Amino acid sequence: MPTETEYDPSLGSKFVFVTGGVMSGLGKGITAASLGRLLSNAGFDVTAVKIDPYLNVDAGTMNPYQHGEVYVLDDGGEVDLDLGNYERFLDEDMTSDHNVTTGKVYQDVIERERSGDYLGKTVQIIPHVTDDIKRRVREAAEGSDVCLVEVGGTVGDIEGMPFLEALRQFSHEQDDEDILFTHVTLVPYSKNGEQKTKPTQHSVKELRSIGLQPDILVGRCEDRLDPDVREKIALFCDVPMDAVFSNPDVEDIYHVPLTVEEEGLDQYVMEQFDMVEDALPAAQRSTEWRDLVTRERTGEVDIALVGKYALEDAYMSIHEALKHASLEAGVEVNVLWVDSEKMHDHHERRIADADGIVVAGGFGSRGTAGKIDAIQHAREHDVPFLGLCLGFQLAVVEYARNVLGMTGAHSAEIDEDTEYPVIDLLPEQYDLEDLGGTMRLGAHETAIEPGTLAHDLYGATSCTERHRHRYEVNPEYIDDLTADGLTFSGEAGNRMEIVEHDDHPFFFGTQFHPEYRSRPTRASPPFVGLLDAVLERADVAPAGSDADVEVTN
């Protein structure tokens, strides 16, 4: 119990701390997000915090090959992609404060030391760093009933030690009934088909050595845990058997909440938190999620995703936005990966076979020629096209070159010496030296021209979407660009935000990233429009047909 001088737990939420063992990439974030979805359905206000134990202040300058996509929040925060999963599952907008990194913590502690806030004390990991971690978690949890806190990495990683120590202290400062430690661990099969518990036992042993005892164990496995395996885990890890849960592989991450519900994890958490009486009766809880993910699909379409990072996580939000649109349209979407650097290999065939084309954003010159070729194919063959950020900019470049005759037209980012810089640096970017957090970031409003495709998609004269860019359409070329069929149907002040083609069934580009605001229960309008155009244009094969389609996810 806390003393009078310690934190008052009555001011905060219930906390579920989620750690991972054995190996990274187990899906502890999806497990936590699924639990959060079910608690939200039960009528509780749920939020989430992702702890990333790296020294980067944020994810903004990290290589997508190493870390996956940089996810952008409304407030301009460039954060871990797991925050995207929390937003999609909880249908709540997060802030930069919901992503805690070692870099943020150390930066703040050092700045406070320099300003004399510590009054001459020796600044140490304990208590100064751990106190800052606890402060950040509690501030992010304000106003919620339940706060899910995911600790990135694996128990035992040296980078995560200060955070786990902070959680150990947290458990002593908080009432016992207000905190649960949930440990997600791997339960692999042996070669003879036996589920092995030893990795879990060793992982829990490591957690205990830090001073943390898990209250709940979730076994990630190919199939549900056998009863005798659950019993063995409970015995050797010192948790009740009814606190050992399975989280088996499923065909789609949006089915995980259904699995978690069947396992009873949400009910167990509510019981431990003494929240059952405050929860909505089961009959009154929303079934929207279940209805969506179990909805029958009546066809399938192939969408080519053109980008330069050969890693699915680098374009996670685009994949998910396509999935959300497919849930609304009632079709299966097969994503055909197209490496924009290999357009003239077998990838060119995928462009030709695709029912629709999405050209992703990115930075730098690598792969831009392939993206321009894909855009030209979409424009000339009336293939439904959606360009995002750089995809929007290159759609303007392609049109300038191949329709308006501006030979060599390009973005100044790619070719500083181009005769026709139809895409140029934002004016406010010229004097900046730092890369981190200096782009045009976050949610900005776009005015939409009535009577346009954009107006049809959004059903309004404005929209608010998230941005992440340094370059824009050069205002000096707008009159030339719009002289013959190209329309900028969305603007933010003097900035061009949306482009469309009057003589094309669906040629649509956005300077912003609509994928960041797409949710399973609220699909992004541009992605819905893309699939609608595909379905209008193509004969869609019945779901489960024997059509020979090459699919690369």
From Swiss-Prot:
Which reaction is the catalytic activity of this chain? UTP + L-glutamine + ATP + H2O = CTP + L-glutamate + ADP + phosphate + 2 H(+); L-glutamine + H2O = L-glutamate + NH4(+); UTP + NH4(+) + ATP = CTP + ADP + phosphate + 2 H(+)
Q: How does its record describe regulation of its activity?
A: Allosterically activated by GTP, when glutamine is the substrate; GTP has no effect on the reaction when ammonia is the substrate. The allosteric effector GTP functions by stabilizing the protein conformation that binds the tetrahedral intermediate(s) formed during glutamine hydrolysis. Inhibited by the product CTP, via allosteric rather than competitive inhibition.
Q: Which GO terms describe its molecular function?
A: ATP binding; CTP synthase activity; glutaminase activity; identical protein binding; metal ion binding
Asked if the record carries the keyword Electron transport, the reply is no
The keyword Flavoprotein is assigned to this record: no
Q: Which family does it belong to?
A: Belongs to the CTP synthase family.
**Name this polypeptide is given:** CTP synthase
